[in-house]
Design a protein with these regions (language model features):
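Glycine-rich phosphate-binding loops at beta-strand->alpha-helix junctions
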Residues: 49, 228-231, 284-308
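A short acidic Gly-Thr/Ser loop motif
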Residues: 49-50, 174-181, 187-190, 199-203, ...
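Hydrophobic alpha-helical bundle architecture
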Residues: 275-283, 287-294, 312-323
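Nucleotide/phosphate-binding catalytic cleft detector across ATP-hydrolyzing
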Residues: 1-173, 191-192, 202, 215-217, ...
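A conserved active-site cap/scaffold subdomain adjacent to cofactor or substrate pockets
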Residues: 202-212
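Glycine-rich phosphate-binding/hydrolytic loop that grips phosphoryl groups
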Residues: 314-339, 343-348
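Residue-level signature of catalytic and energy-coupling elements of molecular machines
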Residues: 47, 140-141, 176, 209, ...
Length: 348
């Protein structure tokens, strides 16, 4: 079972803004779900974490083993523990991605048992502002009085559901077009190479459409029903829109609507392209780019991106073998999928 509750203004750019209002909406969601489940009580929840300040940083841990050293499981564990103890200034570590190992400066995917004098582990840390996690814990655990089973980094969970192991190995960028933010996750060699967030999402497009003198709910409907990432300015087709008072209809040109959408989407995409180019991996993305999320369903978006980046861009909700329907279900499914072997964030 799944349920949806409109976040309104309590979530801004993927982050909890109003703790009390968020708690109220979560309690309503839990009640709706329990009713759908025939009165079964929900005791714990997994929470997906994303938002504006989320990003990856590099952190390297080294250990000198001496001339007769051999890498052991204990050494690998000690490197990981040292990495976990690292506290970057003004940031909270939300997840630690599996590292790349270098033995005497040479890459090694399976280091245990290999002799070397020095081992280096290069980690990708997923970090964010402390409030990113604290506000979630406060709204759910403290205000709503619901136990949190674990907090998972949403883009990583989504990557495990949408991308195949082969795509991650060949090199692939996963771009999640959300309501408040757009997330760029780049994989290479089977591992996460970069994670960054652009603080623009589909909500901005909806707000721009309201400048055509329509209310926000009607603007969202127009975007979903008629919207295109590329405007056909020679198209004379008109569409009917509801008046602000809901008591009548008027007409606007489809080209005018999509001109508004195209302008804002171009701004979002230029920011996405800049983040992709900054990774230095554009030339080695053998599996191309996969787009997902509600905003990714915008008509002609894959073609617009493919033309600009000169590589394959495809829309995908889930990879083969995973059954789901709709972006909201996929987002939820990604948390369930990754919480099985799980690496949930400590909430202490």
């Amino acid at each position: 079972a799944y349920e949806v509750e409109n976040s309104g203004t309590c979530i801004r750019r993927g982050c909890v803004y109003n703790v009390k209002e968020t708690a109220s909406k979560i309690k309503r969601l839990i009640l709706k779900l329990e009713n759908k489940l025939g009165g079964t009580k929900i005791g714990q929840v997994y929470v997906g974490l994303g938002g504006q300040s989320l990003r990856s940083i590099e952190h390297t841990v080294c250990k000198v083993l001496g001339t007769e050293g051999v890498v052991t499981e204990e050494i690998i564990d000690s490197l990981y523990q040292e990495c976990k103890d690292y506290r970057p200034d003004m940031l909270t570590v939300l997840d630690v991605v599996s590292p790349s190992y270098f033995l005497d400066d040479k890459p090694e995917s399976n280091p245990v048992g290999v002799p070397c004098s020095r081992i280096e582990a290069r980690y990708k840390l997923i970090v964010g502002r402390p409030s990113l996690k604290l506000n979630i814990v406060n709204s759910i655990s403290e205000q709503a009085k619901i136990e949190i089973a674990g907090i998972l980094v949403s883009p990583l969970a989504l990557g495990d559901v949408v991308l195949s192991d082969n795509e991650k190995d060949l090199g692939c960028a996963l771009i999640g077009f959300g309501a408040g933010v757009t997330t760029i996750s780049v994989y290479k060699g089977g591992k996460l190479a970069s994670l960054s967030v652009v603080p623009f999402g589909g909500n901005l497009i909806t707000k721009d459409i309201t400048n055509l003198r329509v209310v926000e709910s009607e603007a969202e409907r127009l975007k979903i029903t008629y919207g295109s990432a590329k405007a056909d300015r020679d198209n004379d087709m008109t569409i009917q829109v509801s008046l602000a008072d809901g008591m009548g209809l008027r007409e606007i040109k489809l080209a005018e609507l999509n001109g508004v959408i195209e302008a804002r989407m171009d701004e979002i995409l230029e920011n996405v392209y800049a983040r992709l180019e900054a990774t230095g991996l554009m030339s080695v993305l053998g599996a191309g780019i996969v787009i997902t999320g509600g905003g990714a369903a915008l008509k002609n978006l894959p073609a617009v991106m493919s033309e600009r980046l000169k590589m394959e861009v495809r829309y995908s909700a889930v990879r083969k073998g995973v059954v789901a329907s709709g972006d909201l279900v996929v987002a939820s499914l990604s948390l369930i999928h990754i919480s099985e072997p799980t690496r949930p964030i400590s909430i202490s």
